[in-house]
Amino acid sequence: MTTKTSIAKALTLAAGLSLASMQAFAGADAALYGPSAPKGSTFVRLYNATSAPAAASVGNTQIKQVGAQASSDFSFLPGGDYTAQVGGKSVPVKLASDKYYTLVNSNSGSPKLIEEPPFKNKQKALVRVQNLSDQQLTLKTADGKTEVVKPVAANGRGEREINPVKVNLALYQGDKKVGDVKPVALERGEAAVLYVTGSGNALSPVWVTRPVASN
């Protein structure tokens, strides 16, 4: 075997191994993250704020059952007008392409569709408050000394980019603490969304984050 032939065979083998490695990594990505969404898709997930399990559908797209005060991962479908259904309750929804939404199932009335602007800063973590209660709320450190997210009006949204950290937080009305929030580990490049449902003295704050496994 000549030197040129040996080099050619070695290069062919290396190319084959590289292709196999790329295919293996692609397969691993598909297993971890699911299939890629086509261009122009819209993304929707379910947050079940009730005390009983619930499943949902948006058009022909089924969202698997989640437990009480739990959430699904995002499912994708073409943008457009649909009927969203959770249990026996339904609501018409308009889903724009390249947008993210959370369908909230609560004990009060029809499901609500909430837009979730995507977070793309890989160096920071995002804390977002989706305040679906009937009162203005501020997210602070548990001792009340540091404001994490500025006051958020009833049925409003507020957010802040922060450095990744694990911190104890609480909801306040002015200087009055109205409830502690479960600790959450804020990871770089991730968004932790605090959904606040309920009213008066019966507020229910729950962190909604993407689960490890997708639907």
Swiss-Prot record:
Q: Which GO terms describe its cellular component?
A: periplasmic space
Q: Report the domain of life of the source organism.
A: Bacteria
Q: In which pathway does it act?
A: Glycan biosynthesis; alginate biosynthesis
Q: Which Pfam families match?
A: AlgF
Matching entries from InterPro entries are given as: AlgF
One BP term from GO? alginic acid biosynthetic process
Where would one find the signal peptide in this protein?
Answer: 1-26
Q: Which terms are listed as keywords in the entry?
A: Alginate biosynthesis, Periplasm, Signal
Q: What does this protein do?
A: Together with AlgI and AlgJ, forms an inner membrane complex which probably interacts with the alginate polymerization-transport complex and adds acetyl groups at the O-2 and O-3 positions of mannuronate residues. Acetylation of alginate is important for the architecture of biofilms and increases the ability of alginate to act as a defense barrier.
Q: Which family does it belong to?
A: Belongs to the AlgF family.
Q: What is this protein called?
A: Alginate biosynthesis protein AlgF
Tell me the name of the encoding gene.
algF
